[in-house]
């Protein structure tokens, strides 16, 4: 008999996972406690922008004409408990307010709500990013609360999704990591992931703490690589070097690789910043704080880049005050192909300049609604051309394809001064300079 799957939490991770499980052929029930979110999903609408996700949802959501009907949604914990053989917990784990540590309240609440409705054998699978040691604690709590007792097992299966590529990353993962305590749990998860494993995705079986550490270790490594190249950009600026050529050269070394070597204003979003901080906090609790002290410098370098972009803008305007100066910001999301503005370096820079008196106008292809909610006092435009109209300086802060394809000559007709600061090192300097622009980027020669 085919497995039935529930997905607890239908945000970015949960909605993607639920749709992907339906695509893999399973009957899926998604649960959330927010009525508006459930109503949207039942209509086949996605509460966030993620390429390909809405199409996948509409292909499977019950009640939509032509769908497979394999995917339904509910707010009823009892229904979810009775429905699923495997329950994936995909709720958020934000940073605690005023602390580095991870806020586990959503995860704890999900377990407390689901467990009393598990009356028969079930596997609860955590996918959220949690501090190491959480799975062992949750396994004990699950056994205490579930009527099924020890027949309600726990496994940990960290997610490795990239916003903008989430559907592909779920259906065709570059690895599947499972932390289990029994052969039964491993067998069930192999059954869940039989299709991607058959297509060549590695299936790594380990224990709870290692599975938990894999996710935070991966994010910490990526954050370190980004901050490393940004540190090299600072050295290049001091030595009149070119960080883009430096990155190209060291990227040819197969031990290093080319990815995550583009210097700029640093990383943001809802994962990397809070994950490395929570990792440091947990290491301190375990008495291993010295092992991760380097991550504090990784975080410091990353945050410093935002301030450096503000200073570059000030210098481009003559080195004085921002008062009365018009600043156009291209980009609001923390990365392209997403509408996520959480801890966005672009909005952080825009906000700093606004607070210092600059007249800031922002444009982003997908992040405008979220940006307006987070920074209502900034100015916003409906197009890039509108955003730069009358600008004294233009800041390119999110590397959307739309911005890479802009015509510098056309844009130049709208601005007061043809000055471009490329905060992502993603535009072609020569194309912009030939169109009469002064082009500057972090870690690059000024001419």
What are these regions (language model features)?
Residues 1-447:
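Structural/interface elements that position substrates and couple domains in central-metabolism enzymes
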């Amino acid at each position: 008999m085919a497995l039935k799957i529930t997905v607890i939490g239908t945000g970015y991770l949960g909605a993607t996972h639920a749709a992907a499980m339906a695509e893999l052929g399973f009957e899926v029930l998604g649960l959330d406690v927010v009525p508006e979110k459930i109503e949207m999903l039942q209509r086949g609408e996605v509460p966030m922008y993620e390429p390909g996700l809405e199409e996948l949802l509409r292909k499977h959501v019950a009640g939509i004409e032509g769908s497979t009907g394999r995917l339904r949604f509910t707010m009823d914990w009892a229904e979810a408990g009775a429905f699923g053989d495997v329950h994936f917990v995909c709720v958020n784990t934000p940073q605690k307010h005023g602390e580095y540590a991870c806020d586990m309240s959503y995860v704890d609440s999900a377990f407390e709500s689901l467990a009393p409705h598990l009356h028969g054998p079930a596997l609860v699978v955590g996918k959220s990013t949690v501090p190491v040691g959480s799975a062992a604690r949750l396994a004990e709590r699950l056994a205490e609360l579930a009527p099924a007792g020890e027949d309600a097992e726990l496994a940990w299966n960290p997610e490795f999704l990239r916003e903008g590529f989430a559907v592909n990353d779920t259906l065709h993962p570059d690895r599947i990591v499972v932390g289990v305590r029994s052969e039964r749990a491993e067998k069930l998860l192999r059954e869940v992931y039989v299709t991607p494993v058959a297509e060549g995705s590695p299936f790594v079986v380990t224990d709870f703490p290692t599975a938990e550490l894999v996710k935070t270790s991966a994010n910490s490594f990526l954050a370190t690589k980004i901050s490393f190249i940004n540190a090299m950009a600072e050295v290049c600026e001091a030595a009149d070097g070119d960080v883009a050529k430096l990155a190209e050269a060291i990227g040819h070394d197969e031990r290093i690789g080319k990815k995550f070597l583009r210097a700029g204003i640093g990383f943001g979003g809802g994962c990397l910043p809070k994950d490395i901080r929570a990792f440091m906090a947990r290491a301190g609790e375990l008495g291993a704080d010295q092992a991760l002290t380097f991550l504090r410098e990784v975080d410091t370098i990353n945050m410093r880049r935002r301030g450096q972009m503000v200073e570059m803008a000030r210098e481009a305007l003559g080195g004085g005050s921002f008062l009365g100066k018009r600043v156009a910001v291209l980009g609001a999301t923390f990365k392209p192909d997403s509408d996520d503005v959480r801890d966005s370096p672009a909005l952080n820079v825009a906000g700093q300049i606004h607070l210092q008196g600059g007249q800031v106008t922002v444009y982003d292809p997908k992040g405008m609604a979220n940006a307006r909610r987070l920074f209502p006092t900034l100015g916003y435009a409906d197009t890039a051309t509108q955003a730069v109209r009358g600008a004294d300086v233009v800041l390119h802060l999110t590397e959307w394809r739309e911005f890479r394809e802009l015509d510098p000559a056309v844009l130049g007709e709208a601005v007061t001064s043809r000055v471009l600061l490329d905060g992502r090192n993603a535009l072609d300097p020569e194309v912009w300079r030939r169109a009469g622009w002064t082009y500057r980027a972090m870690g690059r020669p000024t001419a």
